[in-house]
Structures are given as C-alpha cells and as structure tokens.
C-alpha cells in the first residue's frame, strides 16, 4: 500500500511538472528532487544572406532537492571556419523560494543565475550568454499553473564580458541588457490521465525580448512550439523562433529549435 501511494504521488508530481516544461524558457518549478536529466538542444538559425547556423547544446541537469536544481551545458556550432567547434559552456542554478498549492493550481517563484565562458568571435549587438557571449545572467521567474494552462514570466539582467582569449567586447557597444519573457502553454492531450504511459501533448507560445541598457536598442521575438512528453520521462520539443521587431544587429534571429530530453527519477539517494 505504501509503495502504491509513493508511486501515485510521484506520478501526480511528474504529470504536473510536465505541463510547465517550456521550450524556450525555464519555469519557476524545478525538476523532481534527486533526479538526473540529459538534454540536447539543436538550433538551425538562418542568417540574412541565407547561410545556415547550426548550434548544438548538450546539457546535464540535477534536481538536488525541491528547492535547488543545477545545469551544466556545452556550446558547439559551425560558425567558425573549419567546421564544428566547441565554443564554450555554462553553469546554471535555480532556487525556488515560494510555492502555493491548491487543488488544481499552483504558483511558484524562483531566482536563477547563469555563468558562461565562450571563445567565439563577438558578431552581434544582442547579448546572449547561452551560446554566444562570455558573461553572466541573474533573474526572477514566476509560474502559475491553472488546471491545464501554465503561464510563466521572467525578468533578468545579463552582462557580457570579453570572449577570451582573442575577442574583447567592443567598448562602443552596450555590454549589459534586461531580458523579459512571457510563456503560455496548454496541455492538449490526454484529456484525462489514466496512466503514466500516456503521451502528453503541449502547445505553447512564448515571447522573448531584450533591451540593451546603454544604447536602448531592443528586440522582441515570438516562438510557437509543440511538445511531446513520453512515459513522463522522455521529452521532444519542436519550436520556430521568429523576430517580430529589432533595432539592434542580430546575426541569425530566426530559426528552428529541436530538443530531446530524458529524466532519470530517484537517481540519487
């Protein structure tokens, strides 16, 4: 009886968490405690001249407890001459500091931070420490789950540093920015949960924006996506990111994002 209760509680927790797994952003909720995850993000981004940029970002994730989780991520791309090259990596941590749970809803708030190293050339005004710039980001996330609909928003400060050893950040450009996001997702299938083996299908729409602090240049992107959760452990995401407007130089803002993820529950004692 005790074993059945534990399995049931884990199923409820995982099913609820799976409704908040946004493609382009992180929710305030954490992955289940003592779990371990692997993720691989593939981005096919289109430059103005028609050239295709491919970025691969493998990632390891650890749910330390219900409040803390950490990620380690690598950056690989074909932007440099000579084919694919490992350009850098990052460490990410998130602390969930507030939770309010009701019968069919909950509200979460979290703080997060990222520190990245990157050796690639600095080729745009946009600041992006996830794959382009050496630097750091610190921010706040709030996520509301209302039955089958999840709404999440974030605000963060991002700072770019020199891409050592060869590329200094241009002194004529803004080296810091404020980022803001709004994500909405809805569970489309299944209509009723009967088994953890059911495939979850989520549809999402996300808005992603940035405003440079010194020169006040900005952009806003939109990213519709579809997500499949298989047996509550495997995840497949497909999204398209499209620039709505921009007053800054961005090398390749539009493109397709494909993610694969797998979570190992109770991987640590």
Segments from the language model and where they lie:
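Transmembrane beta-barrel domains of Gram-negative outer membranes and organellar outer membranes
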Residues: 18-163, 171-269
């Amino acid at each position: 009886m005790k074993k059945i209760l534990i399995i049931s509680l884990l199923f409820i927790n995982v099913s609820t968490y799976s409704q908040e797994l946004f493609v382009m952003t992180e929710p305030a909720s954490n992955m289940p405690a003592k779990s371990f995850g692997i993720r691989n993000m593939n981005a096919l981004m289109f430059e103005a001249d028609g050239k295709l940029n491919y970025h691969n970002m493998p990632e390891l994730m650890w749910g330390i407890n219900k409040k803390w989780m950490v990620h380690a991520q690598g950056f690989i791309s074909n932007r440099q001459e000579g084919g694919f090259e490992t350009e850098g990596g990052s460490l990410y941590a998130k602390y969930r500091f507030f939770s309010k749970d009701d019968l069919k809803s909950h509200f979460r708030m979290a703080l997060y931070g990222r520190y990245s190293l990157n050796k690639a050339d600095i080729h745009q005004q946009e600041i992006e420490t996830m794959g382009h710039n050496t630097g750091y980001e610190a921010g706040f996330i709030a996520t509301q789950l209302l039955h089958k609909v999840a709404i999440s928003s974030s605000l963060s400060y991002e700072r770019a540093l020199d891409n050592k050893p060869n590329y200094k950040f241009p002194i004529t450009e803004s080296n810091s920015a404020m980022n803001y996001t709004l994500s909405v997702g809805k569970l489309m299938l299944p209509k009723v949960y009967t088994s953890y083996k059911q495939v979850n299908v989520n549809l999402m729409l996300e808005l992603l924006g940035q405003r440079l602090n010194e020169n006040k240049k900005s952009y806003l992107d939109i990213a519709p996506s579809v997500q499949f959760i298989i047996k509550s452990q495997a995840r497949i995401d497909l999204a398209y990111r499209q620039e709505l407007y921009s007053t800054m130089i961005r090398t390749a803002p539009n493109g397709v994002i494909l993610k694969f993820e797998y979570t190992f529950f109770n991987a640590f004692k």
